[in-house]
UniProtKB/Swiss-Prot annotation:
GO terms for cellular component: cytoplasm. It comes from Solanum lycopersicum (Tomato). It holds the Pfam family Aminotran_3. Belongs to the class-III pyridoxal-phosphate-dependent aminotransferase family. It is found in: Cytoplasm. One of its GO terms (molecular function) is 4-aminobutyrate:pyruvate transaminase activity. This is Gamma aminobutyrate transaminase 2. Disulfide bonds: none annotated. It catalyses: 4-aminobutanoate + pyruvate = succinate semialdehyde + L-alanine; 4-aminobutanoate + glyoxylate = succinate semialdehyde + glycine. Transmembrane segments: none annotated. The modification N6-(pyridoxal phosphate)lysine is found at residue 283.
Amino acid sequence: MAKTNGFMGHDMLAPFTAAWMIDMGPLVIDKAEGSYVYGVNGKKYLDSLSGLWCTVLGGSEPRLIEAASKQLNKSAFYHSFWNRTTKPSLDLAKELINMFTANKMGKVFFTSSGSEANDTQVKLVWYYNNAIGRPNKKKIISRKNAYHGSTYMTAGLSGLPSLHLKFDLPPPYILHTDCPHYWNYHLPGETEEEYSTRLANNLENLILKEGPETVAAFIAEPVMGGAGVIIPPATYFEKIQAVLKKYDILFIADEVICGFGRLGTMFGCDKYNIKPDLVSIAKALSGGYIPIGAVLVSEEISKVIMSQSNQLGVFCHGFTYSGHPVACAVALEALKIYKEKNITEVVNKLSPKLQEGLKAFIDSPIIGEIRGTGLVLSTEFVDNKSPNDPFPPEWGVGTYFGSQCQKHGMLVSFSGDHVNMAPPFTLSLEELDEMISIYGKALKDTEKRVEELKSQKK
């Protein structure tokens, strides 16, 4: 259908898309209703990833649409430069300060995306250390397999080789420590807590090797999303935070995916007792209806930044759309809905059925691990149920599973041989049953495909 609608070989340079996909023609989405999206091909798809982890209230929440329309009719745009701003941006900043309770925050800086938020974090960390007389404390430690965005800085922070390849990344001041994927990387007989201890020791050794006086911050998602929903092993963040505190290294919590209920708590920091100095949010902040992100800055860092800006005459960082009034109005309405619906309770009621329903497929011979919490889950396909036996990349097992899901009427995210699902919080029990059913059908198709490929290999 894409061809007949004139979209084959289209003119858009599409993100995270190979040229051969463009030549085939894209799946073009025409409209959204609740948990479903509809293509111009007339087909209906259950959206099991909430767009890109963001449309948590479904695709047709009238209150968010009304909030945007009302603000557009009142004031479509005004900036927040030079001590000028709009009421929605001030109201949203106050609401976020009150809402985030894992640590006391002092200020909110608005962006248009999670990438911009994480990019801003690095500048704030450098600005802060310069202000307090630590000009050499600039290195940022991230984790292997992490995803923190795709700007120059945040692609460097990301620990995925594909984001670095041919982009001359990462820069030398960005370092990467272990990915905390217990199933994949633990030693024989090693418990989760022992694994966490080893990773914390490795982090400390990296800091000592680089020189603690040169390491400024550590960035982490509470649960790693793009890496394939990596759940932190027992005591991991407790041990990591102890190392950071020992060497006076700031903690940046990337809550872009985890924030606003996805894990069954309002923020991932609440679930894992993380006390961050800086926090990045986006995606569900507006329910995905309009681009907006934000940086939450601790009281201590806020005071230093404000003092430094007075000395310099200006805090010289910002974007045209920082605190866009329409985006802020939509975000305010989204936060109201989360409170009214007690969204974490909604997630915790749906979570057991999603987790148990999909984890029931763990005995499949092509599945190594199904991992998840709250309303987020990932399936990792391997041979012999072992992380040491991946399928040949050219087999495209994860891609094939994703294509079969689409054929049966459901959209998932796939990267390599892991497949992610993070459905809207508005999902009905019937829709959840449909999701599990389609997953099972696609899995059978994929098992058959793997058997065919194995027989051809003999």
